[in-house]
Amino acid sequence: MPLRNVMAENNFKMLKIQQCVANKLPRNRPYICNICFKHFETPSKLARHYLIHTGQKPFECDVCHKNFRQLVHLERHQLTHNLPFSCNICQRHFKNLKTFVKHQQLHNESYHNDVKVRRLLETKQEKPVYGMCNTFTADERWALHPCSKSDATYSTTKRRKNIHACTICGKMFPSQSKLDRHSLIHTGQRPFKCVLCSKSFRQSTHLKIHQLTHSEERPFQCCFCQKGFKIQSKLLKHKQIHTRNKTLQNLPLKVKSPESCPLPNKLNAKQDAFESGDMGESEENNPLDVHSIYIVPFQCSECEECFESEQILNGHKCLPARGGRVPSRLKRSCNYKTIVKKLLAKLKRAGGKKSDDLQSEKKRTFKSNYLKNCERSSGKPNIEQTQRTFVGSLSRHGSYKTVSKKKKKTLALPFSWQKQFQSQNTGKSLQGILTTGSILSMDGSVNNKDLSIYGSSGEEYLNCDMLQCGFSDSSENIHTGHKMCPCDKCDKVFPSISKLQRHYLIHTGQRPFDCNVCGKSFRQSAHLKRHKLTHIEKIPYSSFWRVDFGNVNQLFIHPSDDVSYNASQQCEGLGSQSCESSESSQVSEIEVKVEPEDFLLGSHCRSRQSYLANALVESEQSHHCYSYLGRPERSDGLLYQCSVCCKHFRSPSKLERHYLIHAGQKPFECSVCGKTFRQAPHWKRHQLTHFKERPQEKVVLDSTV
C-alpha cells in the first residue's frame, strides 16, 4: 500500500474520532488491561498497549535503526530521512510544501519589508482601541459574563458531569482513568518495574524519574551558578535561592539605639561577623556596634512583630480585644526563633566571611510564661511570682556554652515581651538582656552565681537568688509555635490530632497492625514494615529445622562405629525427603523429614532440602541421623534447635558441628602427633605448630580428610 494511502486512512480515522468527541457519543471500551486497568475499544489497541508494559518496540527504521512501538510513528519518522523540498539558497530541506514556500519568501527582501510594514500598521491600529490594558479585571469579567454574581444555581460541578467515586475510600475523581490509577493504592499493585534495581512503581512517570538516578546526566542546569539537576522541579526550587538573595538586598535598613532595638543580639552579632569577620571583639566595649544596623523584613507598626512574608503580615491584625496576641493560625509564622534563623541563613547566602567563631557563637532566645500569667491575673502581678515564672524556662533547655570564661554572654528577649514587662508597672524598665557567665548542664541544672537579668538602665532586675523555681508543664509548649493537643489521661501534649490519636492506642492497648507471618501486632504501620524485614532476611534459610535423637544414650556407647548412608529424595511438588542410616551396632534408625511452611516458596524449600541431603550424605562428621520439624516461632535468627541441650543455631551446618560435642567425635586427626580435632580449622591451625618446630621438613596437608 502506498504511503499516501496509509496517511489518508489514518487521517480519516482521526477525523472520525474527533467527530465522536464533538458529538459526545459514548464510546464502548470493553477490553481492559489487567496491569493498569485501562479500557480500550478493540483487542488490537489492547495488544498495542501491552507493548508499553513489556517494553517492546517491534518497528525498526532501516536508515538509523531506531525502534518504535507503532507503525505510524515509524512512518512519521521516515519522513525525516526523505525531505523532498530543498532550498537553493541555504541548502535546507523541508518535508512539507507549505513550510518550504514560507521559507522561500524569507529570502525575498520585498516580502520581508512588506511584512514589517504590515505588522507596524496593525500595532498602530490596535493602540487607540485597547490602550495599554492587556487583561480584564475581575469586575470587567463579571460584566462581560452573561451570569451574574448572585447566581446561586451556578455550580462548578456542571462542567464535570461524570464524577467517579472510589468505592473503598469515597474519594472523587474527574475521569475513570484517574480512578483506576487510584485503585492501585488499595490493591497494592505496582505495575511499572525498573530493569536495573527491580524497584516497582505505581505510575510510569515515577519510574521515569527513578531511572534518572541510575544515570549521571543532569540535563537541567542553573543559569546563575551552572549547577546541574536531574529533575526540573528541583531546578526551580534551587532558583528560589538566587531570587531570595536579590530580594534580600532590597530590604530596608534602619539605624536604632540599643534601647529600641526589637531584634535580639543574635542577629546583630551575626551581621557584624559578616561585615567585620572578627567575632573576638568585646560587646561591652562598643555596644553601639551590636545594635547599629538590623534588618526589618516585614514588621507590624503596632505590635512590632516580624513576619517572613508580606502576605502573612497583611493577614496579621492587632486588635485591642486580643490584647496584642497573635492569632493561633499565625503562631507558626510569628515564631521568633525561626525568623531569626532564616534571616541569618539569608545573610550567609548573600555574602560574607565564614568563620568558625560563628558556629561557636550560637545563642538561643528563651520565652517566658510571664505574659500568660499576666493575662490571667486581673490586678498588679506579684513581682516575686513573675521572677519565678520567667526564669523557670531556662532549666528546660539543653547545654549552653560561653565563648570564653572572661567574657559574659548576653541574650536578648523579643521587643514585644519587653514592652509587656514595661506595661505592667513593675517599677523596672526591662531591656531584656540576659547576661550569663555560667554553663547550663545537660540535665537542666543552672549555676546561679553569674546568672542575672539587667534592665536598660543597667540595674539588676532578677538576681541570682530568684532563679530557683521552674515553670508549670503547660508553659513548656508556649514557644513551640504549633497547635497543642493535650492528652486527658497522661497530660502529654502533641502538635497534631493524628499524633494524639496514635498516642491513645497506648492507653487503650490496641495494636491494629498484625503481621500475617508470625501473628505479631504493632501500634504503627511503620513498625510493622520494619518487622517484616526480619522475615525477608530469613528467606535463604527458608525451612525451619529441629533435630531429634532416637536414643541419646546410644550416642556415647560406640563413638567409633562406621555408619553407611542411603539417601532417597522425593521431589514431587513440596513432598518430603528421607535419609536412612544403618549402623553395624545396635543403633536406632532415624529419619530426616522436611515439612515446608505455607508462607515460603516451594523453590526455596526444594533447594534447601537438596542441599541438606547432599551435606548429610557426603559428610562423615556425624554418625547419627536426625529428624527436622518446622519451628517458625523464633524471630531472633536462631532457627535450628538442638534436642539435647536446647541450644539454637542459625544454620544446619553449625547444628551438625554442635552435635559432635554430644557424640564425642573428633574426626580430624593429626598425622604427626595423633591428636584429634572436632573442626578442620582447629586441625589446620595445629599443623602450623609442627611446621614451626620442623621448618626444613614439608608437612603435607591431606585435603580429603
UniProtKB/Swiss-Prot annotation:
InterPro entries: Znf_C2H2_sf, Znf_C2H2_type. GO terms for molecular function: DNA binding; zinc ion binding. PROSITE patterns: ZINC_FINGER_C2H2_1 (PS00028), ZINC_FINGER_C2H2_2 (PS50157). SUPFAM superfamilies: beta-beta-alpha zinc fingers. It is found in: Nucleus. Disulfide bonds: none annotated. A zinc finger (C2H2-type) spans 31-53, 59-81, 85-107, 164-186, 192-214, 220-242, 298-322, 485-507, 513-535, 640-662, 668-690. Keywords: DNA-binding, Isopeptide bond, Metal-binding, Nucleus, Repeat, Transcription, Transcription regulation, Ubl conjugation, Zinc, Zinc-finger. Gene3D superfamilies: Classic Zinc Finger (3.30.160.60). It holds the Pfam family zf-C2H2. It comes from the Eukaryota. GO terms for cellular component: nucleus. The keyword Zinc-finger applies. There is a cross-link at K16, K116, K124, K149, K266, K698 (Glycyl lysine isopeptide (Lys-Gly) (interchain with G-Cter in SUMO2)). May be involved in transcriptional regulation. Belongs to the krueppel C2H2-type zinc-finger protein family. This is Zinc finger protein 770. It comes from Mus musculus.
